[in-house]
Curated annotation (Swiss-Prot):
Protein's recorded name: Lysine--tRNA ligase
Encoding gene, per UniProt annotation: lysS
Source superkingdom: Bacteria
Chief localization: cytoplasm
Source species: Shigella dysenteriae serotype 1 (strain Sd197)
Cellular component GO terms held in the UniProt record: cytosol
Reaction it catalyzes: tRNA(Lys) + L-lysine + ATP = L-lysyl-tRNA(Lys) + AMP + diphosphate
Length: 505
């Protein structure tokens, strides 16, 4: 009977006894000398071995006489008398070890190896060969215990089933869940891919303050902290936008930042209070240039990471290979609520009546632009499955965006949606200092009227604009939501290594 079967079948393992037994084993190791050695060096990871040698026959491997050193966690063990098979897991995947009593120094097999536990971290040296079933394996001539695991692993066959436990103990999730490990490898590839894409287009990566005296750049409720040395209340940033545009004023014409934002808001399948954004600012460009850049970025990432421009998400196939759909906000409302009379969206009372008829509670502080935006979010947003740009956002909900030259009630702004979710937001930047000052005042009035997500007045930013911001376009993309799309994940907590959780009482 294999050891992993035995552990999987025993659903009521006495954890205290297990811990006691393992601690006793560790105590014996301490008595024998160094319990946690740090002198073993591997020369291959499992994926390197599989890539290089899976295609070779056993006869070729024997002729090559290749000796390798690997290290990792013992995930399974099948003891068959004088020989055993072990599955070793490392960062690259898994490799099988063949462990024979007579091929190891005297006493290692019976007195050491057989007393080790699943989850222990081992170092192994030996020669490559293939079993009769064709599995690449290592015939061990040296086997060492590098780290004694005091706690047992989750059931090999059922894994870490409790969803909350997966988030609280992400390390166990990563040990036992191939899909979870792959998700975070893809996340890393996305971040690297974005950086390479941006640098290739002449952008410079920068870092801006995470703690700010005035939170700005988005409509959101901030977290408050206190700086003891300055005896000053500060805010965790809700966006880096205003600092990045200060850099454009200073002459850095193409900048981007990938970093955390913090918003003191609810938690849901698509919202986490601490999340990662990429923001970029490009001088002498407008929002139409950003549309091209966004399409190219997603297409490039999909091709380079997944090897194709079609991405499976749930039961749909997202196509990044063709141009994204482009609709104005009003066109989207009409498309997904055909009975809408477009003229009603130009009248406050008519628009308010539409909003209330579909269950929207209209706040006293809302103007026509906010109402139309809320109608769009209610009737259209969930239907935007394929990549879609929505343009012509009202100026009322776009306090930092440049007004449209033809219709000053709207801005040269877009948001883009994939899978029924907003993924990013871009616009031609407002560089009229006087207009910006007035919009800040409008935001202050909204805050005084009860809108706790309205922006603060940022006098220093207005001063920066008074020195002259070139015609500029800016874009923000939610990295977490992007990773959700590329990994077919349906809750944001699956793509954040350590999501916000209520403490266990």
């Amino acid at each position: 009977m294999s050891e992993q079967h035995a552990q999987g079948a025993d659903a009521v393992v006495d954890l205290n006894n297990e811990l006691k037994t393992r601690r006793e084993k560790l105590a014996n190791l301490r008595e024998q000398g160094i319990a946690f050695p740090n002198d073993f060096r591997r020369d291959h990871t499992s994926d390197q071995l599989h890539t290089e040698f899976d295609g070779k026959e056993n006869e070729e491997l024997e002729a090559l006489n290749i000796e390798v050193a690997v290290a990792g966690r013992m995930m399974t063990r099948r003891i068959m008398g004088k020989a055993s098979f072990v599955t070793l897991q490392d960062v690259g995947g898994r490799i099988q070890l063949y462990v024979a009593r007579d091929d190891l120094p005297e006493g290692v097999y019976n007195e050491q190896f057989k007393k080790w536990d699943l989850g222990d971290i081992l170092g192994a040296k030996g020669k490559l060969f293939k079993t009769k079933t064709g599995e690449l394996s290592i015939h061990c001539t040296e086997l060492r215990l590098l780290t004694k695991a005091l706690r047992p692993l989750p059931d090999k066959f059922h894994g870490l089933q409790d969803q909350e436990a997966r988030y609280r103990q992400r390390y166990l999730d990563l040990i036992s869940n191939d899909e979870s490990r792959n998700t975070f490898k893809v996340r890393s590839q996305i971040l690297s891919g974005i950086r390479q894409f941006m640098v290739n287009r002449g952008f410079m990566e920068v870092e801006t303050p995470m703690m700010q005296v005035i939170p700005g750049g988005a409509a959101a409720r901030p977290f408050i902290t206190h700086h003891n040395a300055l005896d000053l209340d500060m805010y965790l940033r809700i966006a880096p936008e205003l600092y990045l545009k200060r850099l454009v004023v200073g002459g850095f014409e193409r900048v981007f930042e990938i970093n955390r934002n913090f918003r003191n808001e609810g938690i849901s399948v698509r919202h986490n209070p601490e999340f990662t954004m990429m923001e970029l600012y490009m001088a002498y460009a407008d929002y139409k240039d950003l549309i091209e850049l966004t399409e190219s970025l997603f297409r490039t990432l999909a091709q380079n990471i997944l090897g194709k421009t079609e991405v499976t998400y749930g039961d749909v196939t997202l196509d990044f290979g063709k141009p994204f759909e482009k609709l104005t906000m009003r066109e989207a409302i009409k498309k997904y609520r055909p009975e809408t009379d477009m003229a009603d969206l130009d009248n406050f009372d008519s628009a308010k009546a539409i909003a209330e008829s579909i269950g929207i509670h209209v706040e006293k502080s809302w103007g026509l632009g906010r109402i139309v935006t809320e109608i769009f979010e209610e009737v259209a947003e969930a239907h935007l499955i394929q990549p879609t740009f929505i343009t012509e956002y009202p100026a009322e909900v776009s306090p930092l965006a440049r007004r449209n030259d033809v219709n000053p009630e709207i801005t040269d702004r877009f948001e883009f949606f994939i899978g029924g979710r907003e993924i990013g937001n871009g616009f031609s930047e407002l560089n009229d200092a006087e207009d910006q000052a007035q919009r800040f005042l409008d935001q202050v009035a909204a805050k005084d009227a009860g809108d706790d997500e309205a922006m603060f007045y940022d006098e220093d930013y207005v001063t920066a604009l008074e020195h002259g911001l070139p015609p500029t376009a800016g874009l923000g993309i939610g990295i977490d939501r992007m990773v959700m799309l590329f990994t077919n994940s349906h809750t944001i907590r699956d793509v954040i290594l350590f999501p916000a959780m209520r403490p266990v009482k």
